[in-house]
Regions:
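C2-type phospholipid-binding modules
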Residues: 129-135, 257-286
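C-terminal motif of bacterial Sec signal peptides marking the signal peptidase cleavage site
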Residues: 16-19
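Tryptophan-paired
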Residues: 58-114, 191-272, 311
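Acidic/polar, low-complexity intrinsically disordered N-terminal segments immediately downstream
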Residues: 22-111, 118, 270-311
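A sequence/structural signal for flexible, mid-protein segments enriched
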Residues: 130-228
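Bacterial N-terminal signal peptides that target proteins for export
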Residues: 1-8
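Intrinsic-disorder/low-complexity, polar/charged segments enriched in Ser/Thr/Lys/Arg/Asp/Glu/Gln
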Residues: 32-36, 83-87, 166-168, 179, ...
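Short, low-hydrophobicity acidic/polar segments
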Residues: 71-174
Length: 311
């Protein structure tokens, strides 16, 4: 009898531990709800899912349908593939719907959550965006490529694994970054210049829409001097939101004089045949200056603008 009195509690303890994947919850808490995800990218122009490389880091933030924070988890050394599964364990397992938000590529040196995720009061007050310097520029010119996604996971779609409720889903990620490779020819090699893209898209709500109030940003890069062909690269965040107002500007560093100033979407990108901002994220911009003080602007090989200029 004494042997049974000793062994039965041990057996019960082992049962509890294994039923919750080795986790023991205090005060009679339920075993966790396990949210499992396999994120992927697929634009309307892609025939099959893709799994971008170099994501490195991803944060998943989970709210209930009323906007209360239920939990979050940051994954490091992230590798996306069709076999990748990322798991978030929640002690609350009685929600009908879990609202899940994803920021992939959210490198700490480039981006920030305001307020900090652990201090989020509600979904409506959560924002995410670039770290900006005092002059409104990203702290890192070529910040990490960014992806966003969201999905509502319903408890009705769950299954039981051990004593835990498991919900599996495949969230779609949308790329939020754009690269502009600017190549300049025909300009005096010694003239110090820089390119800027000015916009209002430095910060987002957790659902991926522009934050309110909007936060202005200047994406800037100096154009190296001393060669007949000069090249630089700018990276921006998402441009296809209808409320973004990107302006492409070329300036002289020494005088501040503007050499070029365009509405990037209306005057330039909008003139590209078949332009689809949800699909296109790399743009090669050629600025060809001529001795007659004219400039021709091409994007991805298409001439989108030409006119006379004085400087």
């Amino acid at each position: 009898m004494k042997f049974l009195q000793r062994i039965i509690p041990l057996l019960l303890l082992a049962l509890v531990a294994t039923s919750c994947n080795g986790l023991i919850y205090e005060q009679g808490d339920d075993c966790p709800t396990l949210l499992r995800f396999t994120p992927y990218v697929q634009t309307p122009c892609m025939e099959a899912p893709a799994y971008p490389q170099g994501v490195d880091r991803m944060t998943v933030v989970v709210f209930n349908k009323e906007g209360k924070l239920l939990g979050y988890k940051t994954f490091k050394d992230v590798v996306l593939s069709e076999k990748s599964v990322f798991e978030v364990a929640l002690s609350e397992n009685k929600e009908a719907v879990y609202r899940c938000f994803f920021w992939a590529g959210d490198a700490e040196e480039d981006y920030t959550y305001i307020p900090e995720i652990s201090k989020l009061p509600t979904l409506a007050e959560a924002t995410f965006g670039l770290k900006l310097s005092a002059n409104g520029r990203p702290e890192n010119k070529l910040f990490h490529t960014l992806y966003h996604g969201n999905i509502d996971v319903r408890n009705a779609d769950s299954h039981i694994e051990g004593a835990s409720t498991v919900l599996y889903s495949k969230p779609l990620l949308t790329e939020y970054s754009n690269d502009f490779v600017v190549r300049v020819t025909g300009l005096r090699e010694s003239m110090p210049c820089r390119m800027e893209i000015r916009d209002n898209n430095a910060r987002y709500s957790m659902n991926g829409a522009l934050a309110s109030p909007q936060v202005n940003v200047i994406y800037a890069a100096d154009i190296p001097s001393g060669a007949p062909r000069r090249e630089t690269t700018l990276r921006t965040l998402r441009l296809d939101d209808a409320t973004t107002q990107p302006e492409l500007v070329m300036l002289r560093n020494d005088t501040g004089e503007e050499l070029l100033h365009f509405d990037l979407k209306k005057d330039l990108l909008g003139k590209l045949p078949g332009y689809r901002p949800e699909c296109d994220h790399l743009f090669v911009v050629d600025l060809k200056f001529s001795p007659s003080m004219a400039v021709e602007i091409s994007i991805n090989g298409w001439v989108v603008h030409s006119y006379d200029i004085e400087f």
